[in-house]
Amino acid sequence: KFNEDGTPDYSAGTYDTDWQDEIYRAAVSHEHNVSLTGGISKKSWSMPYRVSVGYTGQEGILKGSDYKRVTAGFNINPSLFDKHLNINVNGKYSYSKTNPGGQDAVGAAVSMDPTRPVKSSDETFKNWGGYWQWALPTTSYDPTFPYNRNDDAPTNPVEKVENYDFYKSAHILLGNVEADYKIHGFEDLHLHANIAGEYS
């Protein structure tokens, strides 16, 4: 509502909104892992292996915030030439996606007027999806946007957690190859090599 001179009406409303209750939740998390192990064995060589995949999903206590991660990995250990050459190969990949949510919603929930509703069917708020806001008549001549948000007043915290995504993602790839060769006739003498790499 506005006064006759167009300024906002700051008198108390009729609602009893617990803004902090509107933006917080009981968080749920879950994790799933599957692995497969096996091997191939012949007279002069063998190759055990392991493959695994996993998924983690965690909700934050702030609505809209979450963390998701997918992982995959493998390991093979071939042993060749009557166990004179032993190789260890490892590979791991992970993809994570994080949304901290509308972080400034916490401050808005503390300062927002509790006598205002979360949403309103009033035409004043249609440009914000019906979320109640402190609004001012616009000075532009765009008939589709008759009101502006009052930047000097708190913003509706529920709109912040429901309409704003701040996703950050990361890919990480790790690899390692290790080889050990036991020289024939000089079994106490070994040649050893190790190569590792990371990409993110």
Language-model segments: what does each one mean?
Residues K1-T37, P48-S52, T56-D66, T144-R149:
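Surface-exposed beta-strand-turn/loop segments characteristic
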Residues K1-Y15, K43, I61-L62, N75-L174, ...:
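Surface-exposed loop/interface segments of Gram-negative outer-membrane beta-barrel transport/assembly proteins
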Residues V28-H32, D66-V70, S169-G175:
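Residues that define the transmembrane beta-barrel architecture of outer-membrane proteins
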Residues S29, I40-W45, F81-K83, K182-F186:
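Outer-membrane beta-barrel channels and translocator barrels
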Residues N33, S46-S52, T71, H84-N90, ...:
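Membrane-spanning beta-strand positions in outer-membrane beta-barrel proteins
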Residues V34-I40, F74-P78, G175-Y181:
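Residues on the lipid-exposed face of transmembrane beta-strands in outer-membrane beta-barrel proteins
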Residues S52-G54, F166, K182-F186, N194-A196:
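Acidic/polar N-terminal loop/beta-strand segments that form early-domain functional surfaces
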Residues Q58, T71-G73:
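Short helix/strand-bridging catalytic loops that position acidic/His residues to coordinate divalent metals
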